UniProtKB/Swiss-Prot annotation:
Organism this protein belongs to: Halobacterium salinarum (strain ATCC 700922 / JCM 11081 / NRC-1)
GO molecular function: ABC-type phosphonate transporter activity; ATP binding; ATP hydrolysis activity
Domain of life where this protein originates: Archaea
Name the UniProt record assigns to this protein: Phosphonates import ATP-binding protein PhnC
Species lineage: Archaea, Methanobacteriati, Methanobacteriota, Stenosarchaea group, Halobacteria
Topology relative to the membrane: Peripheral membrane protein
Length: 280
């Protein structure tokens, strides 16, 4: 787990301010959802947190250390998966160990036994152990995103960032993938920040919420604080009739059968498939 301190963060691109005076602190183990319309600054904020984008002014600290570039202890899940479609789910997951081994060793699967086990455990966590040898390009969008989650887990991060991880998925697959992200965060004790624009999903899986508008943080609170008035402030006058509240939004569920074409394998992430051919 990691704690994050963001202080007076500002990022501009020419005359355009993507982030303005953003400050907050995330505690160890929190599952935080960043809400906001497209262009609100969510992606820029996450890229500053993982060191992919350098802020114009202000600072980001993880466990008290300034973020000055990409860090091995920060895993990232992208909207467009960023997986290699010609490779199998297993090989894609194994590539998460690149921060500990060379590209050549990873491509030829010359990884040590523990790294191979890490990849299999990660695929098990997201319900894809039985599909380890399936080529990623033949998988559904939801399954591909789950491969991306497994790759991030193999990186062995303390902090997990997810940038609109379900934006391109249908509602059922989106709920499934968010369930796996929440389950992975719980099992691996990860501090997690996920940007979303689906309020229902945010309320279902989020513990804390940061609302952004025009590059600024306009809300920071918990589920009971995320009222319809707050949602209107973040998104404008949207239809709130279908937004779930109360008990309907409190199910932190990782489904055992996925709507995106995959099913959970038997056993948990600590299961060691000692006879698995990937370990030879």
């Amino acid at each position: 787990m990691s704690n994050i301190t963001v202080t007076n963060l500002h990022k501009s691109y020419g005359d355009v301010d993507a982030l303005e005076d953003v400050s907050f602190e995330i505690l160890d183990g929190e599952f935080v959802v960043i809400l906001g319309e497209s262009g609100a600054g969510k992606s820029t904020l996450l890229r500053c947190l993982n060191g992919l984008t350098e802020p114009t002014t202000g600072s980001v600290k993880i466990d008290g250390e300034p973020v000055n570039g990409p860090r091995d202890d920060v895993g990232m899940i992208f909207q467009q998966h960023n997986i290699i479609e010609e490779m199998t789910a297993y090989t894609n997951a194994l590539s998460g160990s690149l921060n500990r081994t060379s590209l050549v060793r990873s491509l030829f699967q010359w990884n040590d036994r523990e790294e191979k086990l890490d990849a299999l455990r990660a695929l098990d966590t997201v319900g894809l152990l039985d599909d380890a040898e399936q080529r990623a390009g033949r998988m559904s969008g939801g399954q591909q995103q789950r491969v991306g989650i497994s790759r991030a887990l193999v990186q062995d991060p303390n902090l997990l960032l997810a940038d609109e991880p379900v934006a391109s998925l249908d509602p059922a697959s989106a709920e499934s993938v968010m369930g796996y992200i929440k389950d992975a965060a719980d099992q691996h004790d990860l501090t997690t920040l996920a940007s979303l624009h689906q309020v229902n999903l945010a309320r279902e899986f989020g513990q804390r919420f940061i609302g952004m508008k025009d590059g600024r943080v306009i809300f920071d609170g918990y589920r009971d604080d995320l009222t319809f008035d707050v949602i209107d402030d973040i998104y404008g006058n949207i239809q709130t009739d279908a937004i779930r509240t109360g008990d309907d939004a409190n199910a932190d569920v990782a489904p055992t059968t996925s709507s995106d074409g995959g099913t959970d394998a038997a056993g948990g992430p600590d299961q060691q498939p000692a006879s698995d051919p990937h370990l030879s």
